[in-house]
Structure formats: structure tokens, C-alpha cells
């Protein structure tokens, strides 16, 4: 097997870039966009490059490629993973390798805790609230392994939940419906008022007590409902106001932690985006059912918080069925979110994807499926300098009355996600334009969580750029299956420079520089 595997999910400025070279004998190249920055040969199965400026890089050898990024703060380009099993004696190597392979620079430790209102356990081994056996020693070892792999271990914590054993203590601070019944999740968790000073003091102290495990921060969860509720005395609690205040309180009381709050189904992103947290995280549910909805969620979140990276948690229940059809759905999801400047929470454990909100019941996937998905993450990391610093100019440059960019294909071309079409978008990037092409031509719908028809490479796509000066622009193409930017030779007409693209599967990026506007 030939593989290039970064030593870390993300490297820090001033840190040497170290890559495992498995089965690689020849030269290994470090590339920024289309410029070879350095070249080295493996020594003892490892390649090392000198520290590099912040940004995304490709790493290529004959028969293998990967990507790395150099970031002072990993959460400026987050790639979120998960772990959810902590049995005694569990090995950690597989999780660490998956973190490195998918460049997962933050990992959620889902349901690692003793109880929702008492995170640290009374004993080293215990059963969690749903009966899963947990070893705190295993949690510690996984935290250490994830950290060593260049990732931030994030402890799951629900912001307003208590179990049956704690409800009598907290009932006076409970959240109730108008008929007096308590708000609950299922039949085992009761919601408490997140504005209660008694609860806030307890909650932040409970969070602080977990830092000795080695966590870098917290995944602050809520359940989407209620959006408003009553206290026992009839006082109305508005969660739109309560959640940002809680986030800020956690940041003030546990200032050394990095925090991620779950905006369930986009509620209340408009309010929490200004709170003191690392990024904007949205767990996606109906009625956000289409690829267009995923695109809208990322776009809106970036507009609300321009300096906040965006993560979508869009669980693929399609993986409970045919894996090939689910992989195609994943490819379309990743292409959509990455090309809009967001990232996703989907991969984790040793080789698993999330199919529902209870992470313990994740789905293990085949090595070939994992490898196909990894190539999409590689592309997003390699070209992060373009994808995460882009302005969408599709509506002013492509389609309709616009003349700046033209796309021809064997199928219809659309500027929105449309089943049966090639979805084209134009992004303004430093020094030029980036055209994103997502192939939906074989699909009957654009539902993101539905099995998809496996795409065959689309051929005969032509991209034309309106000439701005005498010098022809430089055009190059990259895709998950061919990640190195490959130069394209344009044909010149009176007004346009046109290239015919090589066939590509599902997603391609065309970079246009020098003369593009």
C-alpha cells in the first residue's frame, strides 16, 4: 500500500511538517497551489519539510497524495470529528490515524461523561446515562492520542439537561410547558432554565472540573426545543436570549477553554453568532432537506459572522443502506459545503460516519469508501486558501445576462443546485476567479440525505472567460481524484478564452488567474 499520512491534523507556524511515507521511495513534493515549495526523500519512512507560512498545502509523490495546513489557530479552518466508545483497554492508534488521515483538527468526545449534571464520575469505570460502559482511563488516553495527532479534544456537555437522579434537586429551576408538564428529551432528561444563576454556577464549575482530563474545550449541546418555556412560577424564559448569555458565561468562567455551541436546525444562530465562542456550528434537520439548503445555511452563517468559520453536522442516514449510493450522497454534501466555505462533522472513530444524532450508533465504512471521502477532505485542505477566502460572484458573472464566465456541458448548466444539471458557481479569490462545478446531471433529486446514483465522469465541459487584456489568463483544474492543479491551454476567440476540461467525477475546481475579473 502506498500512502502519505501527515503526522498531525494541522501544523503550527514554526513547526516542521512531518509526513509518514508508507510504501513511497521516490521524491515527495510540498506544493502551494501549483508552486512546488520543497522536495524531499523519505528517511526511515518519514518525510520532513521546513516550517511554512500559514496556509494550505498539497503533498505529492508518485502514486500518493495528501494535504496539510499550517494554522496559528486550527479552528479558523475546523474539521470536526468524533469518538464515542471508551471501553477499558481500548487501543487508541486507529482513532489517531483517522484524525491524521482526515485532517480532523477538533474531535468531539461524545457521551464520555458520568451524568449530564455531574460530568466527572465517582469511579474510574462506570455506566453512562444510557448504560454504555465507560473507562475514564480510556477517555484520558484518547484525549492524549488526539492531542498528539494535532487535534483539539472537545468534551460534550449539554447546557441544560439533568437526569432522573438529579431532577428533584433542579426541579425548582426546571423548564415547563404551559400545562405544567416539564420539557424533556425522550424519557430520561429534564430541561432546566439556562438563565438560572444557581444552574450557571453549577454548570461552569462542572465544566471546569473536567479540564484535568486534558480537554481543550467544550461542545455545548442543546436540543432545539423549547424555544421558549416557563419556569414553575410562570416566568417566561426566551432561549434566544438565554443561549448567548450562557455561552458568554462559560467563556468568562472557564476562559482557557475553546467552545462550540450547537445551533440545532439553525436555532438561534442569528443570536449566538455574536457570543464568545470559536465558530458557528449548525446541526441540520428538516425542513433543511436539500443541497441548496446546506449551501444557504453556510452562506447565511458566514454573512452573520464573517470572522466565524462554519461547521454543519448533517448526518447521513443513507449510510444505513447501500454504501455506494451513500458515498455519492456524501460526495455531493462535501462538495456543496466545502465549495461554500464551510466544513462538516461526519467522520470519526477509526473508520466511521454519523448516521444519526446518537453518535454511539455510528456506521463503520469500507476502506475504499473511506479513501474516496478522504480525497474530498484533502482537496478542501489543499485549497483552503481559495475556498475559505472567497466571495461568491456567481449572480454577477455567470448565467442570464452575465458575460464574464460561460459554461457549456452535455447536460443543462444551472447556477443553483438542480437535479439533472451541472451546478456552476463563480468565486472571487485572491488574484482571480475560482469556478466550482458540481455534477448533479445523473441525479433525480437534490435531497442531501438520500441515496444517490453513482456518477460517471462527466466529459465535454467547456469553460470560457471574457478576455480583459491582451494576455490570456492562466487556467488550471483540480478535483478530488486529481488534486494537483493541471494547466489547461485555452482556445482564443474574439472575446473569450475557452478550455475544454478533462473528465471529472462529481466535483472540480477551475482556477483562473491573470486577466480574470
Located regions from the model:
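Extended acidic/polar, glycine-enriched regions
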Residues: 26-27, 33-76
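An acidic-aromatic substrate-binding cleft motif
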Residues: 65-115
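Active-site-adjacent "subsite" loops/lids of carbohydrate-active enzymes
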Residues: 85-89, 155-213
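Aromatic-lined substrate-binding rim segments of carbohydrate-active enzymes
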Residues: 113-159, 234-242
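Active-site neighborhood of glycoside hydrolase catalytic domains
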Residues: 195-279, 285-296
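Aromatic/acidic polysaccharide-binding cleft in carbohydrate-active enzymes
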Residues: 222, 306-398
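Carbohydrate-binding surface patches
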Residues: 407-469, 508
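C-terminal beta-strand-rich structural cap/linker in extracellular carbohydrate-active enzymes
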Residues: 492-517
